[in-house]
Swiss-Prot record:
Pfam families: ECF-ribofla_trS. It comes from Bacillus cereus (strain AH820). The lineage of its organism: Bacteria, Bacillati, Bacillota, Bacilli, Bacillales. Its main location: membrane. This is UPF0397 protein BCAH820_2657. The chain crosses the membrane at residues 9-29, 40-60, 71-91, 114-134, 142-162.
């Protein structure tokens, strides 16, 4: 079994706290469904630290949000946040990609966009199915929530998560226009 490094554990703690606290704020778009800018945290931390960190930040952070908010822990949605964080972290495993070192190409950005979008869709469908099957929620309510949450998460991912991650990578790019004279 791989051990988690101290750096990774700290990143998971910070990411979970940020995601958990920022998850308390959002804009209502459907019954119990919000556009939450906190989703960008999963994109950035997943890209920086990988799928395991993304998974744990999503799980822990969403549990923190639900606990502080006082509406009870909705495990289907907690797991869906973990799934989203996990898929956002796939990009970190690509050879040549590093937000920390500013190394990436257009293929990496496309890969992050595609895996992120697929992860969001899978995660939200899972949460909806979980609510219907396990929690006994009405189908028509869940359809509205799933559609609203998918649209909201895609918007946050494309407008905040992806650009912030690319911006961090660009700012860390190791390049210079200076030339060494011989």
């Amino acid at each position: 079994m791989n051990k988690l490094s101290t750096k990774l554990v700290v990143a998971i703690g910070i990411g979970s706290a940020l995601y958990g606290i920022l998850g308390l704020w959002g804009f209502t778009i459907a019954p119990n469904t919000f556009i939450k800018p906190a989703l960008a945290i999963l994109t950035v931390f997943g890209a920086l630290f990988g799928p395991v960190a993304g998974l744990l930040i999503g799980l822990i952070g969403h549990t923190v949000t639900d606990t502080i908010a006082g509406w009870g822990i909705w495990w289907g949605w907690v797991i869906s946040s973990g799934i989203i964080g996990f898929t956002m972290g796939f990009i970190q495993k690509r050879v040549g990609f590093s937000v920390k070192n500013g190394t990436y190409n257009k293929g990496d950005i496309s890969y992050l966009a595609i895996t992120g979008l697929i992860g969001i869709v899978i995660a939200i469908i899972f949460a909806g199915a979980f609510d219907i099957i396990v929690m006994g929620e009405p189908f028509d309510k869940i359809v509205i929530q799933v559609l609203g949450a998918t649209i909201a998460d895609v918007i946050v991912f494309l407008v905040l998560g992806l650009p912030i991650t690319i911006g961090l990578a660009k700012s860390n790019k190791k390049h210079t226009h200076l030339k060494i004279e011989k």
